[in-house]
Design a protein with these regions (language model features):
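Active-site beta->alpha loop and helix N-cap motifs at the rims of alpha/beta catalytic domains
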Residues: 2-10, 14-143, 153
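C-terminal alpha-helical cap/extension of soluble enzyme domains
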Residues: 4-15, 37-39, 48, 207-292
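Alpha-helix N-capping/helix-start residues
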Residues: 18, 24, 56, 148, ...
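Short, amphipathic alpha-helical "lid/cap" segments that border enzyme active or binding sites
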Residues: 24, 28-31, 148, 282-289
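A general structural signal for well-ordered alpha-helical segments in protein cores
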Residues: 27, 59, 63, 88, ...
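Catalytic alpha/beta core domains of metabolic enzymes, predominantly
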Residues: 128, 141-248
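Glycine-rich phosphate-binding "P-loop"
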Residues: 137-138, 160-161, 271-272
């Protein structure tokens, strides 16, 4: 069940022109590059897609564009989350979900709910959503951690929640989830640098930032892990580790956008309050790419 997500998914960027408008030509080029290089699936309008700086009409335009272009060649997961539970449900219900297979919903940020509040938040969303939900734990951004106990409660009690994107960086927590979860509940790495150890511990795949630039390599890493070929996976892991670390030296997605411009895949433009990486980081990323 949901075996398509036992692979490398890409957390797709949103390319912009210098004037801040959406660069659909670059988005098309990037999507075709991903498909050609065997990416498993797309995650649209997540953190890496700068969804927080897109208005409703822009989000609709991106969804429609991606769904039409992908044309069922790969699964598409849509990011819809927030710290107003009712508004998240309203957004899900008002969005045309044709061509979308699942919803990735980040934990509520800023208002810092209790673990009970987090559970109730996802229960309300799961009961209202016509599509399966993947929860997203990224405490470095949200200010709240979805504990292993809460994740397992969600996994056991909310049947419309099919997995978690785990980006806490907390391997003991991830191990506890993997060791105690229901069989079909997916544990997906949300941290490129920890993908190999997460897979070795029993994880199911990754939603990756670096895959925007290196989809073929990261897809191979995941498939090697799934086949138990960890020596081969380790070779790719260490080959990419320096560039992975470099693109996260400054707030993402600034680093990956710098890399994509160097690779001539997309322009290095972000929307305020995000800005491009500094010269030192950009030079390092450029040097590492040249050495790959």
């Amino acid at each position: 069940m949901y075996t398509a997500y036992k692979s490398a998914g890409v957390a797709l960027i949103t390319p912009f022109h210098k004037d801040g408008s959406i660069d659909f030509k670059s988005l098309e080029r990037l999507i075709e590059y991903q498909i050609t290089n065997n990416i498993g699936y797309f995650v649209v309008l997540g953190t890496t897609g700068e969804s927080a700086t897109l208005n409703k009409d822009e989000k609709v335009a991106i969804i429609d564009f991606v769904v039409e272009l992908v044309n069922k060649r790969k699964p598409i997961i849509l990011g819809i989350g927030g710290n107003n539970t009712q508004e998240v449900v309203n957004c899900i219900n008002s969005t045309n979900l044709d061509g979308i297979e699942a919803i990735l919903s980040v934990a509520p940020s800023y208002n810092k709910p209790s673990q009970s509040g987090i559970f109730q938040h996802y229960k309300y969303i799961a009961n209202a959503s016509p599509l399966p939900i993947i929860i997203y734990n990224v405490p470095s951004r949200t200010g709240v951690n979805i504990s292993a106990e809460t994740t397992l409660k969600i996994a056991n009690e909310l049947k419309n929640v099919i997995g978690i994107k785990e980006a806490s960086g907390n391997l003991p927590q991830i191990m506890h989830i993997i060791n105690n979860k229901p069989k079909n509940f997916l544990v997906i790495s949300g941290d490129d640098a920890l993908t190999l150890p997460t897979m070795a511990l029993g994880g199911d795949g990754v939603i990756s930032v670096i895959a925007n630039a290196y989809p073929k390599e990261f897809s191979k890493l995941i498939h090697f892990c799934l086949d138990g070929k960890y020596d081969e996976a380790k070779t790719i892991h260490y080959k990419l580790l320096d560039i992975i670390n470099a693109i996260f030296l400054e707030v993402s997605p600034a680093g990956i956008k710098a890399a994509l411009e160097i690779l001539k895949l997309a322009p290095n433009n972000l929307r305020l309050p995000l800005v491009p990486v500094g010269k030192t980081t950009n030079s390092l990323i450029s040097k590492l790419i040249q050495n790959l």
